[in-house]
């Protein structure tokens, strides 16, 4: 297992657990980041800024790196075609 912030660009992984306070976990689930959802890392903003990800529904989201560190994912897959 690894965390969402460590997925390399253009790779995807499935969320396995949200290791967050209940309110933060509920917010992530409300925007589509929940257990079982596949997430593709598009890019990370420079200087520790947010991560730009795409979820399996096609929605693109910006996720704070601090929150992403607390989202467990399975092993990233091979590079995703663009």
Task: Report residues per predicted region.
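Short, Lys/Arg- and Gly-enriched loop/turn segments at beta-strand edges
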Residues: 25, 46-54
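Short, compositionally biased
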Residues: 30-31, 51-63
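Glycine- and charge-enriched low-complexity intrinsically disordered segments
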Residues: 65-82
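Short alpha-helix capping/helix-loop boundary micro-motifs
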Residues: 20-27
